[in-house]
C-alpha cells in the first residue's frame, strides 16, 4: 500500500468533518430508504444466496441485508477503525481484511452477489483491472456486482471526485460499462441516485430534483441536440451481470 494511503486510512474515521458511523444502530434509519430500495431491486430472491460486501465500512449494507432476511452475507473492510465501528453497532459478519486478498481466497464461481459501495474510485486504473477480473472470476454465472461510485457526468462531479484525498478517479455510465463489458460481464445497467420520497421533507426534495433535473436535460439538449437521459446525481449505481 502506498504511503499516502497508509497515512489517510489510519485516520479514516476521525479525520473528517462528520462521523462515518452513527452513534447507534437506530441512527442508520436515514440510509434505510435507499439501501432497502437497492436490496429489493437488485439482490437475489434467494435469501440463502452468498453475498459479500467489499469495503463495507461500518456495515450498513450488511445490516439492512440481514434485516431483510439474507442469511449468508458478510462484509470486509481494510480499516480497523471501520470494523471496530461495526462491532460497536452490533452488526455481525464484518471482518477486517484486504479486499483483493479476500477475492483471491475465494473459489471460482462461488459467490452470488458482490457489493462495493464507494470502493472502486479508490483504485488507480492499473489496480482496478485485476480487481474487476477477480470479481468476475468468483461470481457465479448470472451473479451480480452492485457498484456505487462517484458520477463523473454530474454537474457537481468534483465534489465527490475530490472530496476524499484517496479517490483516484470517477466514472460515467459509459466508462463503467466500457470497463465491465470488456472484462467479461454480459450486461451493465446504471441508475441515478435520485431522492426517495418517504416523508414530507424527502418528497419536497424529490419534487425539486425533478424540476432541476428537467432544466439540466434542456441545457444538455441545447448543446447536443439530444434529450439523452443523462445521470445527473453526484453518485451512480451500476449493476453488472456476469
PLM segments and residue spans:
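Conserved N-terminal segment of class I S-adenosyl-L-methionine
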Residues: 1-109, 113-117, 126-133, 191-195, ...
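Short alpha-helix
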Residues: 168-183
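Short, hinge-like loop/turn segments at secondary-structure boundaries
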Residues: 91-93, 163-166, 206-209
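A C-terminal cap/extension of S-adenosyl-L-methionine-dependent methyltransferases
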Residues: 146, 190-242
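Short glycine-dipeptide loop
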Residues: 139-145
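Short, glycine-/aromatic-enriched active-site segment of Class I SAM-dependent methyltransferases
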Residues: 147-169
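A short His-aromatic
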Residues: 121-123
